[in-house]
């Protein structure tokens, strides 16, 4: 694993048959908007993120993790606990698909500003470009959702939130950060979502240089939120992972290791590099 790096559709047949629904689903194809599961702090009690490595390969997901479905019209990505050189990790396989795993929690980013995780990507998605909504795919995403007062948001955002709630029965988080692996955009680039100002993507890795090796990434979520949204964050209410290729229709494999929030910046990883 590498030392952490800090800050410095094709439309389906069903959609063609119901164009109004297809148009609305296009708005929901925001790499995670349609259904994130429980996202209000009152409904969760888990103080931290359950480790994948605590389970045995082939077992069910650790307590707290749950499927994250974007739309019944989208093929889900396959997630499994597998052994990787003696360690249990999550393997993701996407085949023109999009779905994720989400873990609700309640955490104050001021107390736990550092987010650390591991991921591994074998190949990039050739046509992916997260600055273009019709090519918005990533082999790996680490997603952090924040609570807040939705009534404070601009009218356009509130209307978008209302539309999502009417269609899915789910309330969008007040704000969402997505850490992605981009093809070309420079490290630390902030990419705004095309439909709402409350979802921002941050390029945590870019290009081909580190493909095929485990990467350990550390981000200061507090600083990233301030930079992306220009305000102080509310509580962290969920963390998730997602591998998606629904817009490009490509096939991709990726792996995710444990995810942790920390009070202090972690030291260098014990394993500097691992294939």
What role is predicted for each listed range?
Residues 140-142, 197-207, 211-249:
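Extracellular beta-strand ligand-recognition surfaces/modules
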Residues 31-32:
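C-terminal motif of bacterial Sec signal peptides marking the signal peptidase cleavage site
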Residues 137, 148-195:
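Extracellular/luminal beta-rich ligand-recognition
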Residues 36-70, 155-160, 273:
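Extracellular carbohydrate-recognition regions
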Residues 91-111, 124-127, 196-204:
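Secreted extracellular polysaccharide-interacting domains
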Residues 77-99:
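Short carbohydrate-recognition loop motifs
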Residues 111-165:
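Extracellular-facing segments of soluble proteins and assemblies that are Gly/Ser/Thr-biased and enriched
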């Amino acid at each position: 694993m590498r030392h952490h790096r800090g800050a410095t559709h094709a439309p389906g047949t069903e959609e063609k048959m119901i164009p109004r629904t297809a148009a609305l689903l296009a708005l929901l194809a925001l790499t995670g908007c349609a259904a994130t599961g429980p996202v209000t702090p009152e409904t969760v009690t888990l103080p931290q993120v359950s480790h994948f490595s605590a389970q045995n390969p082939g077992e069910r997901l650790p307590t707290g993790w749950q499927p994250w479905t974007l739309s019944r019209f989208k093929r889900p990505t396959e997630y499994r606990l597998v052994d990787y050189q003696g360690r249990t990790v999550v393997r993701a396989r996407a085949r023109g698909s999009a779905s994720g795993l989400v873990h609700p929690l309640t955490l104050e980013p001021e107390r736990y500003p550092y987010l650390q995780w591991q991921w591994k990507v074998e190949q990039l998605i050739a046509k992916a470009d997260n600055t273009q909504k019709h090519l918005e795919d990533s082999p790996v995403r680490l997603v952090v959702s924040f609570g807040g007062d939705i009534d404070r948001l601009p009218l356009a955002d509130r209307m978008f939130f209302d539309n999502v709630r009417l269609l899915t029965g789910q309330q969008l988080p007040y704000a969402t950060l997505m850490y992605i692996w981009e093809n070309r955009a420079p490290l630390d680039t902030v990419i705004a979502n095309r439909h709402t100002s409350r979802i921002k993507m941050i390029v945590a890795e870019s290009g081909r240089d580190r493909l095929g090796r485990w990467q350990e990434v550390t981000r200061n979520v507090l600083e990233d939120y301030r930079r992306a949204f220009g305000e102080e964050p509310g509580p962290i209410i969920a963390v998730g992972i997602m591998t998606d290729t629904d817009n490009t229709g490509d096939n991709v494999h990726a792996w995710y290791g444990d995810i942790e929030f920390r009070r202090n910046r972690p030291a260098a990883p014990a394993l500097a590099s691992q294939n």
